[in-house]
């Protein structure tokens, strides 16, 4: 069993409170390494806190149950606590914690829509895609806003 933290470091210009658009149904995508055969799998897994599954041979539940295609080891993933909105421009911050049994998280793949608020105007930006740098204009604050230099990392929690 291991707990892993998803960490973010990004340059925020004119925005704050970066988070998934609908955290309850948001799918987080990760590349994983099986702790049985040590294979890093090419296809990403997707985990959502809105899904729960019974863990085979256990009374517990997980957000995802996954079986390694190489060694058939069963892995479970649980999202612990809410996503912590990112506000700390250019500082690495833990934004999410997951408990993983049978696998390790090795890479986060940003996908889906994210939201942020204007730092000065509180304008809601609700269609942010983080696959690359993001730029927009905050009409209420009359200034450009951006999210750049995104660096996602995974560490032991």
UniProtKB/Swiss-Prot annotation:
- Cross-referenced InterPro entries, in alphabetical order? CXXC_Zn-binding_euk
- Annotated family: Belongs to the UPF0587 family.
- What species is given as this protein's source? Schizosaccharomyces pombe (strain 972 / ATCC 24843)
Q: List the effects observed when the gene is inactivated.
A: No obvious growth defects. No increased sensitivity to oxidative stress caused by exposure to hydrogen peroxide (in vitro).
Quote any Pfam family the record assigns: CXXC_Zn-b_euk
Q: Please, which domain of life does this record's source organism belong to?
A: Eukaryota
Q: Where is the signal peptide?
A: none
Q: What is this protein called?
A: UPF0587 protein C2D10.03c
Record remark: domains? Requires a bound zinc ion for normal folding and solubility.
Q: Name one GO cellular component term.
A: nucleus
Q: Where does the chain bind Zn(2+)?
A: 34, 37, 68, 71
Q: Which UniProt keywords apply?
A: Metal-binding, Zinc
**GO terms for molecular function, please?**
zinc ion binding
